């Protein structure tokens, strides 16, 4: 596999640990993930103010913590972005994406609300998605207090967060929920079936591979794994993608999710959804976070931040 990795990404690839999220090693995996993600938290920046709030959760469920990133100085209502972190539906927190959310604020001129949704296996589907929907409703209903322009709310996330982004777009459409101007599911985890060609092609134990993906989906779906799974859990199963918001998505060439992302982007276009899609040669899952100094990583990040900025701009009538 190493010879397929982009030259700029090989150094970090060589030091990656093996991914083992199996049930017998899960607590160790969660501990490792927490320690790894903590190393990426935000350094102080006087241009961005970060705060935490607890908001009403779904019906008969606990409150949900959200982490809010906003410009320290703002003079008008800004577009809002609901960000959903990754972690295979099993690990992670808003803090792991502090640096990225700060960049969204500074470069896309927006306010970011990152949702600390409940995690599997303790809280399988639909709990994580319902937490995200509750956060979307809260942002929309409290937009004036948050200084957010309610006509310019986007949703975005990476990996499992990308899967939840795609699912949330479907759910908001079908429930006739808050209006979403743009969705940005990045390298999204959207297909529980694990039967696409790239699922069998990407086997290296240093990468999120088929074994890890099956384990993740089993934890997220719980008792319904292997059954006729809801498209709100696995958006690749959705048969109707019409009426979804304009979309930007991307994936690395040697990412397990390559095939399902390509299919998803293609089906969005067939459904008449304005869609931009990028694939990065030699990119493994999460490459731009794992090797942030590589030129290809910086290009990928610049391109999706640029797409978000453009989508959030006011349209003159």
Residue ranges and their predicted role:
Residues 1-68, 313-317:
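A glycine/proline-hinged amphipathic helix-loop "lid/cap" segment
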Residues 60-64, 71-80, 242-244:
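Proline/glycine-enriched tight loop/beta-turn segments at coil->beta junctions
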Residues 95-114:
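Short amphipathic alpha-helix adjacent to the substrate-entry channel of hydrolases
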Residues 123-145, 304:
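Alpha/beta-hydrolase active-site loop
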Residues 140-155, 175:
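Gly/Ser-rich "nucleophile elbow"/oxyanion-hole loop immediately N-terminal to the catalytic nucleophile
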Residues 170-227:
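Hydrolase active-site cap/lid region
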Residues 249-251:
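Short beta-strand/loop motif that positions the catalytic acidic residue
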Residues 294-317:
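Catalytic active-site module of serine/aspartate enzymes centered on a nucleophile-bearing elbow/loop
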């Amino acid at each position: 596999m190493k010879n397929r990795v982009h030259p700029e990404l090989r150094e970090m690839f060589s030091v990656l640990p093996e991914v083992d999220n199996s049930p017998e090693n899960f607590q160790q995996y969660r501990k490792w993930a927490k320690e790894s993600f903590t190393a990426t938290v935000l350094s102080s920046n006087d241009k961005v103010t970060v705060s935490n709030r607890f908001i009403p959760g779904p019906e008969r469920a606990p409150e949900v913590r959200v982490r809010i990133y906003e410009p320290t100085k703002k003079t008008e209502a800004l577009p809002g972005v609901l960000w959903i972190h990754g972690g295979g539906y099993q690990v992670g927190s808003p803090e792991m994406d502090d640096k990225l959310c700060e960049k969204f604020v500074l470069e896309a001129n927006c306010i970011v609300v990152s949702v600390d949704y409940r995690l599997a296996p303790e809280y399988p589907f639909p709990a994580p998605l319902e937490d995200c929907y509750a956060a979307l409703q809260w942002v929309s209903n409290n937009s004036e207090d948050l200084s957010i322009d309610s006509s310019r709310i986007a949703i975005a996330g990476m990996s499992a967060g990308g899967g939840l982004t795609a699912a949330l777009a479907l759910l908001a459409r079908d429930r006739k929920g808050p209006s979403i101007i743009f969705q940005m599911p990045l390298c999204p985890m959207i297909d529980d079936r694990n039967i696409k060609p790239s699922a069998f092609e990407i086997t290296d134990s240093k990468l999120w591979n088929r074994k890890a993906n099956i384990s993740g989906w089993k934890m997220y779906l719980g008792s319904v794994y292997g059954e006729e799974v809801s498209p709100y859990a696995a958006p690749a199963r959705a048969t109707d993608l019409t009426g979804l918001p304009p979309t930007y998505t991307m994936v690395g060439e040697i990412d397990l999710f390559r095939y399902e992302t390509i299919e998803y982007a293609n089906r969005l276009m067939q459904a008449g959804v304005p869609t931009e899609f990028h694939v990065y040669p030699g990119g493994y899952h999460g490459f731009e976070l794992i090797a942030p100094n590589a030129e290809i990583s910086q290009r990928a990040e610049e391109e999706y931040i640029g797409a978000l900025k453009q989508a959030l701009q006011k349209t003159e009538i």
